[in-house]
């Protein structure tokens, strides 16, 4: 059983993956709040409580974090609480198998890399990956499996919260689908702007990529979405053909499998 940990700015996804290669399957997944000051002991207490008896069945662990301080604590947690379990952390120097054709490869978030790796592995073609997180990342992988870059925009919830925080007349609202694109009250107006507005943003970016990037105008380009808020927005997005809830976890597994031989026997 592989333990996969995906730490983002606001939330952390913990998954258990059985099998490997084409037989791999995410059997459990949890989403918890990210605490930027959490210690290795606190992380271990939380994760051990989630995975329960499967803690004794772990054959490997893999993690990424967009929060540098948490990355260190996750590594420390694995070394202290599961010392006999080989683990891989996604960071510079780890083999991902995906060339980064950008100005500064070290700037590229680990989440973006593993998403593109998973998309290319699944479809075997050029792909556009849309990750609906605290930021919306629209990333591009070539037909050769190369990371070409992408676009980053504020996420749906982050933008809605920012609007409420900076305006005395607005308040934080629950992000649900409004009755119409034309809101009849302030809450519906904010919901409309968030949901339909970001659906248009995603369509605009995907269409622009198809127009501007050589080789991306054809039907053989896969467009896949992932992320917690994706199901909320995708019904109004016209350019995304696939949704994969486990895309990041699958990418983490792929990186672990590429690096596990060097991790065997690690103490």
UniProtKB/Swiss-Prot annotation:
Subcellular location: Cytoplasm
GO cellular component: cytoplasm
Enzyme category, top tier: transferase
E.C. no: 2.7.1.33
Cofactor binding mode and count: A monovalent cation. Ammonium or potassium.
Classification via InterPro entries: ATPase_NBD (IPR043129), Type_III_PanK (IPR004619)
Annotated metabolic or biological route of this protein: Cofactor biosynthesis; coenzyme A biosynthesis; CoA from (R)-pantothenate: step 1/5
Pfam family, one: Pan_kinase
Sequence positions that bind substrate: 109-112, 186
GO terms (BP aspect): coenzyme A biosynthetic process
Presence of keyword Nucleotide-binding: yes
Domain of life: Bacteria
Residues binding ATP, per UniProt: 6-13, 134
This protein's UniProt keywords: ATP-binding, Coenzyme A biosynthesis, Cytoplasm, Kinase, Metal-binding, Nucleotide-binding, Potassium, Transferase
Cofactor: NH4(+); K(+)
Active site: 111
Catalytic activity: (R)-pantothenate + ATP = (R)-4'-phosphopantothenate + ADP + H(+)
Role description: Catalyzes the phosphorylation of pantothenate (Pan), the first step in CoA biosynthesis.
Subunit structure: Homodimer.
Family: Belongs to the type III pantothenate kinase family.
Protein name (database record): Type III pantothenate kinase
Species per Swiss-Prot/TrEMBL record: Mycobacterium sp. (strain KMS)
